[in-house]
Amino acid sequence: MDLYNLKNNMLEPVDRESFKLEKDIQGLIENNVETLFNLEFISTEFTVGDFRLDSLCFDNENNSFVIIEYKKGSSYSVIDQGYSYMSVMLNNKSDFILEYIEKTGKSLKKNEIDWSQSRIIFISQSFNSYQKNSVNFKDVPFELWEIKKYSN
């Protein structure tokens, strides 16, 4: 879809740009996660066992954790990565609670969290059709969000 700026009743095309690095996407989202997703940012590059989670957030409305993963391009490993991260979260609940307490200074008990509402958000400049179709199943705890960058 093309975008235009309106100036003096004339349309000027807006050029699309690419994010050069995955970190550029990550920084933008982490700084604006409350505005974009109504989530509380907890931690960046959170490590649990052998896994490094890009962004850890908390959904105060649903009392659940949300992991955000960033992809520079369309990767084929989105769904298996999502299930791995969901498994890591559900098998290491105390690590997530401890990270929340350490980063926010607020108390949180295991029984206050609705683990069934936990989810993974993937953000990329594009996803392939297989990835888009794979999240159409009911109750799949994954969301795919495409991000676009435009000049000026």
Residue ranges with predicted function:
Residues 1-152:
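Charged, terminal alpha-helix-loop-beta segments
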